[in-house]
A protein has these predicted regions:
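Short cysteine clusters
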Residues: 1, 32-35, 148, 188, ...
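Flexible, glycine/charged-enriched surface loops at secondary-structure junctions
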Residues: 33-36, 49-54, 102-109, 140-141, ...
Length: 325
């Protein structure tokens, strides 16, 4: 793809290109397998429900909505909003683990439960029995919103971090980005949700305000977040974070995490665009948030209506002939 991202986006919009094959046909110079996944992500963000999904443009994980493991089985991570679950959900998870002989059930660092070792042809049945939405643990999208218990239970909490985390996760579930995105919401500066090393973090401060942080990392590369701004209400926090997420989605390079994106753009510029609305894009960001949220459909519902024949069929083994010497 010979065009930089801003030029590519402008051409795609002008020509109304809504599928990867259409973009490659009109704007590409050669068939490029490596660019397909990035184009698919970009087009889904641009067009929402109008995007024409071609599964051969996506990685195997995205085709079956589960994360393939080294032995060819898959992991299933249901959505638990803000890391909060219920007795009924836990019972169903346990029943599924027994019914399908799941070899490992593991708590994740993002306050979720991972069922590992699921056979491909069991995926639709597992999803149906769980009765929970996809946690998007397999793709470049919003993953988790980690929370502490906040002011509802903790004697140190200065604000309701759990409620904000749940609201954020429900608002932005299914949003896809150039790379995965993880959030954290801490109910006080003790930072039990590790918000200062998330792609987007929120920390409650004295006086009931929320401090919004961006560009953190806690993996192979560790980076403390930059302070974006402070806001007074939960609604303001959700809105500011939405604007940042769309700005990141529209301007980041494919596979560029926020911890690279924010330093590349510069926190002063990011703050100017998001908080001060220096480019006059605030209304655009808000519109894109609502359009993307409206286009959300739980991908695990494909269990009832697969997109293509054999989508969840087990891989067939092929017996090779024995060659005589």
């Amino acid at each position: 793809m010979p065009l930089d991202k801003p030029t590519l986006v402008a051409e795609v919009k002008k020509r109304g290109l809504k599928s990867v094959s259409a973009v490659l046909r009109e704007l590409g110079t050669a068939e490029d397998e490596k660019s397909k996944a990035g184009l698919a992500s970009m087009l889904k963000g641009l067009w929402g429900a109008e995007y024409i999904d071609q599964r051969d443009a996506r990685f195997v994980n995205d085709r079956v909505h589960a994360n393939i493991q080294k032995d060819g089985t898959y992991s299933v991570v249901p959505r638990t909003y803000g890391g909060v679950t219920t007795a009924d959900e836990l019972i169903r998870i346990g029943e599924v683990a027994k019914k399908y002989n799941v070899p490992m059930v593991k708590y994740t660092g993002g306050q979720r439960i991972d069922l590992l070792g699921i056979k491909k042809d069991d995926l639709p049945k597992v999803w149906a029995d769980l009765g929970m939405p996809s946690g998007y643990a397999y793709t470049k999208a919003l993953r988790t919103v980690k929370t502490c218990v906040g002011s509802e239970f903790c004697r140190y909490g200065t604000n309701d971090s759990t409620a904000l985390g749940i609201a954020l996760e429900k608002k932005y579930q299914g949003f896809e980005f150039p790379a995965k995105v993880k959030l954290g919401v801490s109910g006080c500066p003790r930072n039990c949700a590790e918000s200062t090393v998330k792609d987007v973090g929120v920390v409650a401060t004295e006086g009931g305000e929320w401090e919004i942080l961006v560009g953190g990392a806690a993996g192979a590369h560790v980076r403390k977040t930059d302070v974006l701004c402070r806001v007074k209400t939960q609604a303001e926090a959700i809105a500011v974070i939405g604007r940042f997420l769309i700005y990141y989605r529209d301007n980041a390079k494919w596979l560029e995490r926020t911890y690279d994106f924010v330093p590349r753009m510069g926190i002063e510029k990011v703050r100017d665009v998001i908080v001060n609305d220096s480019l006059g894009l605030g209304e655009h960001f808000d519109t894109e948030v609502e359009k993307t949220a409206a286009a959300y459909v739980d991908p695990w519902l494909e269990r009832d209506k697969p997109v293509y024949p054999g989508q969840f069929a087990a891989a067939r083994s092929i017996a090779l002939p024995v060659l005589s010497s």
